Regions:
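Short helix-initiation/N-cap motifs at beta->coil->alpha
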Residues: 79-84, 167-182
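Conserved N-terminal structural module of periplasmic/extracytoplasmic solute-binding proteins
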Residues: 1-10, 23-26, 217-220, 242, ...
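Short, solvent-exposed loop/beta-turn-alpha elements that line the ligand-binding surface or hinge
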Residues: 22-33, 74-80, 109, 127-152, ...
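Hinge/lid segment of periplasmic solute-binding proteins
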Residues: 3-63, 117, 207-213
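Glycine-centered hinge/linker elements that transmit conformational signals in sensory
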Residues: 87-90, 133-171
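Extracytoplasmic/periplasmic solute-binding protein
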Residues: 40-48, 53, 83-139, 185
Length: 351
């Protein structure tokens, strides 16, 4: 009776089976409609876990950089836009021997265990800003308005990393996690879920922070971290009334009872979008970093990659990013995969 979809694209396949949750207790407990999937006034899905990603950073190493006599940026408060990030990354790279690191950024691995960080999560930024500028929340034809911004952050990763750009095809997600957790790199693009991969190593808990991914857009000083969900509860409307009610009761128990909340927050380590979880935050410094940005009034970047037209679109974009990095392709190919590929894949998926 209870099933899960990953967002608007997944919902399109299953929406005819979705029970309207608009009058449910669990919907009343949601912080905002940012965390629900709607079809008109009907609530088809409710996120039960929200996650956050950005640039995980090593506070101790960054402070070591700030203390360099010729460091242009002297505090984390100044590191609030792309130009500042570029300056810091390039100066860390120039002083990597002094700082005892292999590079400013961990390797941008493009094997299948890591490429999603760039073809999906990094690509979310230009999509987010285009949607925001155009006042939309999905499209059948992306324009690529912010592709120059995508290029400059990708270039920054490639040119200020623990490895040469030509080596990224064989670099893995484990490589990047290891480089960060051993103190070989200052910045690591990933999310709150990566905590378990990097804890209990060289980087102390109190030295783990997270920065927004700045790509050089006006006003990004007020940008927060990328926060959203790919995990939405849906209820099968074709089930018996008895089963539907039992499922609604179970969902209410999960988000309102002490036992249910303890299970989600502490045993599973989830951050949830429910008002009932104020006292149930997992013991994860990356989660706390996001809470600090929210409290400071920063605007979170929504997860718009859930509107990407297909896996094929992501894979073609990833291939173009890799070819560009290795010098076997041009940025024009990235643009083609991003813009033309979107229209083609959207049309194919919605025939």
């Amino acid at each position: 009776t209870l099933f899960q979809v990953n967002g608007p694209v997944g919902l399109a396949t299953w929406k005819d089976y979705c029970y309207d949750l608009s009058k449910s207790d669990v919907y009343k407990d949601v912080e905002s409609d940012d965390y629900v999937l709607k079809d008109g006034d009907a609530v088809d899905g409710i996120a039960y876990v929200i996650e956050t990603y950005g640039l995980i950073y090593n506070k101790a190493l960054l402070n070591k950089y700030f203390e360099l006599p010729d460091a242009s940026i002297k505090s984390i408060d100044e590191l609030n836009n792309f130009q500042a990030l570029k300056t810091v990354a390039e100066e860390i790279q120039a002083h990597k021997d002094d700082l005892g690191v292999e590079g400013a950024f961990t390797s941008a691995g493009m094997d299948s265990s890591s490429d999603w960080r760039f073809k999906t999560h990094l690509a979310n930024l230009p999509i987010y800003y285009e949607y925001k500028a155009d006042g939309i929340d999905s499209t059948d034809a992306i324009k690529g308005t912010y592709l120059d911004n995508y290029k400059q952050i990708w270039d920054l990763y490639l040119n200020n990393s623990t490895c040469e750009p030509s080596m990224i095809s064989s670099k893995t997600g484990d490589d990047a996690a290891s480089e960060f957790s051993l103190g070989e790199a200052v910045f690591y693009q990933n999310g709150t879920w990566a905590y378990n991969d990097i804890k209990d190593n060289e980087v102390a808990e109190e030295d783990m922070g997270m920065l927004p991914i700045y790509i050089g857009v006006d006003g990004e000083e007020n940008q927060g971290l990328c926060t959203g969900s790919e995990n939405y509860w849906c209820v099968n409307k074709n089930a018996s009334e008895e089963d539907i009610q039992a499922t609604l009761d179970f969902m209410k128990w999960v988000v309102e009872s002490d036992e249910g909340r303890d299970m989600l927050a502490n045993q599973m380590g989830f951050v949830t979008p429910f008002t009932t979880f104020a006292d149930y935050l997992p013991d994860n410094p990356l989660v706390k970093a996001n809470a600090e940005y929210t409290e400071a009034g920063k605007t979170p970047v929504s997860w718009n990659f859930t509107t990407m037209p297909s896996e094929n679109w992501k894979n073609n974009l990833g291939g173009a990013l890799l070819n560009y990095a290795q010098g076997t392709g041009t940025w024009d190919s990235v643009q083609t995969a991003f813009v033309d590929g979107w229209a083609e894949e959207y049309a194919a998926a919605n025939e």
